[in-house]
């Protein structure tokens, strides 16, 4: 048996007509003479904090990667997650991203989360290592214990500052960077900004005891070279403290053995050079090709331009 329509549904059917919605919504998409697009290209808005012209063909990403004389941005332990690398929580006023948004005229109640600003690199890159739970082994108290927080130590001065200020300092110096880490680097939920952030900071290579699979792939896609310590070798056996300069030499090929050259001063002021064999974690020829192009976007642009010429 079919039930009879209620009085309310009958009234709605008589009062609400499709034409009412068409009258309101269709004109919203009709561009007038003033609004007609002058160009097929998107008109980037300089004040937007949500979508901004990507910088992936500019700055550090446009410069050649030398893999020479790199300074460590951080020396990290085991189980560093993508949330350490690029948190997605709410943006606080006293954070680097919060200060930037405030400067851009955004009220604090509209800061939103880091995740919502992924389309604006000027906001999102300030999330790099912005996790207050981070332990950067380069930042220690006077008793030698590691200080918790989004901190870094800028070398050669040895000055400790907030991570973003350290990144800015190195960016202004055009200083290539490296990250040293323990096992299971990059575990957790997949976040593209966990790789984008370090690359935009100027990180050219990451040496770890092991990588999470998806994050390693994302690093390759951003043109960051993943390197793996040989078994039994790590930041502790090498007694790394962050004052060193790092270079990588050798033929980059799938899982080839490269040499990590570490230069540091000894206690008596003499120079010491260590040559440490590491495994290149570009696992396939395709990954080598993507890395050599500068990343997956650069590789795509390269293939597109070559196709246009052909």
Q: Whereabouts are the PLM-identified features?
A:
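Generic secondary-structure signature for well-ordered alpha-helical cores
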Residues: 17, 81, 106, 129, ...
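Histidine-centered active-site/metal-ligand motif
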Residues: 2, 193, 215
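Short, small-residue-biased leader/transition segments that mark boundaries at the very start
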Residues: 2-9
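Short hydrophobic alpha-helical runs that function as membrane-insertion/retention elements
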Residues: 204-209, 226-229
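Acidic, glycine-rich flexible loop/linker segments
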Residues: 215-290
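Glycine/proline-enriched, intrinsically flexible loops and inter-domain linkers
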Residues: 24, 213-214
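Autoprocessing domains of the Hint superfamily
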Residues: 188, 275-310
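Non-catalytic terminal/interface segments that mediate subunit docking, oligomerization
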Residues: 32-207
């Amino acid at each position: 048996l079919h039930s009879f329509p209620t009085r309310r549904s009958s009234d709605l059917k008589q009062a609400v007509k499709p034409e009412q919605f068409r009258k309101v919504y269709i004109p919203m998409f009709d561009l007038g003479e003033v609004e007609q697009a002058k160009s097929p290209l998107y008109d980037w808005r300089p004040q937007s904090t949500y979508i901004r012209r990507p910088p992936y063909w500019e700055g550090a990403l446009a410069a050649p990667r030398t893999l020479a004389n790199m300074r460590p941005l951080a020396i990290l332990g085991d189980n560093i997650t993508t949330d350490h690398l690029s948190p997605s929580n709410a943006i606080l006023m006293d954070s680097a991203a919060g200060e930037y948004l405030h400067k851009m005229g955004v009220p604090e109640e509209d800061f939103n989360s880091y995740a919502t600003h992924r389309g604006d690199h000027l906001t999102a890159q300030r999330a790099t290592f912005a996790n207050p739970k981070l332990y950067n082994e380069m930042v220690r108290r006077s008793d030698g214990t590691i200080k918790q927080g989004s901190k870094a130590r800028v070398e050669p001065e040895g000055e400790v500052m907030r991570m973003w200020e350290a990144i800015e300092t190195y960016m202004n110096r055009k200083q290539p960077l490296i990250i040293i880490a323990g096992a299971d680097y990059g575990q957790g939920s997949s976040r593209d900004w966990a790789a984008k952030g370090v690359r935009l900071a100027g990180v050219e290579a990451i040496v770890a005891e092991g990588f999470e699979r998806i994050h390693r792939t994302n690093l390759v896609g951003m043109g960051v070279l993943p390197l793996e310590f040989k078994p039994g070798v790590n930041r502790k056996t090498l007694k790394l403290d962050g004052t060193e300069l790092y270079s990588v030499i050798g033929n980059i090929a799938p899982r080839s053995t490269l040499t990590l050259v570490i230069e540091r001063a000894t206690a008596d002021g003499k120079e010491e050079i260590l040559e440490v064999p590491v495994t290149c974690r570009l696992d396939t020829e395709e990954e080598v090709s993507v890395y050599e192009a500068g990343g997956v976007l650069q590789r795509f642009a390269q293939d597109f331009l070559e196709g246009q010429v052909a």
